[in-house]
Every structure is written in C-alpha cells, then in structure tokens.
C-alpha cells in the first residue's frame, strides 16, 4: 500500500469540484504540500484560504495556471519543485465537456493535449532512471471512455478514451521498471462538478440526454469521487484503471481493460 504522508502533490483543475475535493482528501491524509493549479483565480484563492485555515499556510498554494498554455504549466511545475525539492504526485484533473462548434477544440486542448504535456513533464521530473526518485501520475479519464455514447458528448468521450490509452501505455510494467513512476487512470461515473453543470453540445437535445443518463446513473458527490481516487492511489499498480461510480467504493477494472485490448488486437499480427 502506498502512503500520501509527507508527499508533495500537484492537482490541476483543483479550485473546485472533484479537484478541490482531492486537495482536501490529500491534506487529510497528511501530504506535505499541495499545489492547486487552476485558471479560476477567485475559486482558487478561496480554496487556498479554506485549506490553509484548516491545515496550515505551508500546506497549500494556489497557482493561477491555464494548463493549455505550456509556459504557465511548466512554470507551475518549476515553482513547486524549487520550493520543495521534488514532486511526488500529479493529478491531472483539469477538464471540460463543451462540444459547441466554437468550443470543441478547447475541450480537446484541455482534456488531452494539456494533460499529455503535464504527464510528460511529471514523468521527466520524477523518473528514477533520469535522476528522479519515482512518483505517481493519476490521470482523470471517465466512464464515457468505456462507452459508445450518443452523438452529444462524443468528443469529450474521445478525449477521455485517449487519456485512458495514454495512461495504460505509460504504465506498462516494462516501462515502470525503469522509471518507477506509476500511472493510474480513474474513470468517474456521473459526478456533481462544473463539468456536469456546464455540459455543452452542438446537439440541442443534450439536456434531455442528460436527464436520461442521470436516471440510469445517479450523480455522486465530488467527495465520494475523491475518496475513490485516494483508494486507487493507495492500492493501484502502474497501468491500472479504476472505476468510481454510483457512490460506491473504487473498483479496479484493469483486467477488463486488458481483456478488451487483447480482443481488439487478436488479428493484428497475423
């Protein structure tokens, strides 16, 4: 089992929703410091103030950062590393679900392009074979990555499927043996968050689809999602995938993901 005690963490999209809940759970578990990266300065300063009051001023730091601007993202990494000497954990949580014609490219930029840049920077700084001391990267995918969704949030689903594939690939045992950096994917079910509240689509029926989906899968709280993420951190192997839905404990679904890849690749090398 892996411990969070005395670890230094970065959480992107940490100003509200699931990200803020993760920050709180990490602090309750005894992390040394959490850097909150978010573009929302008002919410970021607010959560920083709340957490500092409860856990101490040195335990948390808000850094205004648009993760799609690589210079800002890398500067946040360097600032955290220079202040604490190292980074142990990165949670790539920043994301949106907006598929309106003028927004779908930003959904891709935030959900996958920026997440990839953050993942690679974390890997560069942590990897043991390049002078680091190992660590853990947790990438937030979604239950949408496991489904063929109706054409309402299919771009969002595609970005989350890409996140899942990236994380599973980087987490392969043969690669982890060299880097000592775990990569873990978390697939959340419907969760009350800004993404949930601000769902956007080119399809005008999005609200009707949302209502149907909620009946099938009642939304869980961000706090439940964060508890599931901590469980995955403590017990997950590199390359593992965890499902957190319906307000139930986190489930390791790695064997199912691996089986799916086996089926899909059956005839490739014949």
Where are these regions (language model features)?
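Conserved NAD(P)H cofactor-binding loop of Rossmann-fold oxidoreductase domains
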Residues: 93-98
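Rossmann-fold cofactor-recognition segment
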Residues: 51-69
């Amino acid at each position: 089992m892996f411990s969070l005690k005395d670890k230094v963490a970065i959480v992107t999209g940490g100003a509200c929703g699931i990200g803020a809940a993760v920050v709180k759970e990490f602090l309750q578990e005894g992390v040394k410091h959490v850097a909150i990266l978010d573009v929302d300065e008002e919410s970021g300063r607010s959560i920083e103030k709340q957490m500092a009051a409860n856990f101490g001023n040195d335990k948390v730091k808000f850094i205004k950062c648009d993760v799609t601007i690589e210079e800002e993202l890398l500067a946040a990494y360097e600032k955290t590393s220079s202040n604490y000497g190292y980074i142990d954990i990165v949670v790539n949580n920043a994301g949106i679900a907006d598929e309106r014609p003028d927004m779908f490219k930003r959904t891709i930029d935030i959900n996958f392009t920026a997440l990839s840049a953050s993942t690679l920077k974390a890997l560069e700084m942590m990897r043991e074979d390049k002078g680091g001391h190992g660590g853990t990267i947790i990438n937030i995918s979604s239950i949408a990555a496991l489904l063929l969704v109706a054409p309402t949030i299919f771009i969002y689903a595609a970005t989350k499927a890409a996140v899942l594939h990236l994380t599973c690939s980087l987490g392969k045992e043969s690669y982890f043996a060299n880097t000592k950096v775990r990569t873990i994917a978390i697939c959340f079910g419907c969760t009350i968050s800004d993404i949930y509240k601000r769902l956007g689509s080119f399809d005008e029926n999005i609200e009707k689809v949302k209502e149907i989906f909620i009946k099938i899968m009642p939304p869980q709280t961000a706090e439940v999602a964060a508890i599931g993420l901590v469980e995955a951190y403590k017990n997950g192997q590199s390359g593992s995938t965890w499902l957190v839905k319906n307000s139930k404990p986190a489930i390791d679904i790695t064997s199912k993901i691996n089986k799916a890849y086996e089926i899909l690749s059956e005839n490739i090398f014949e």
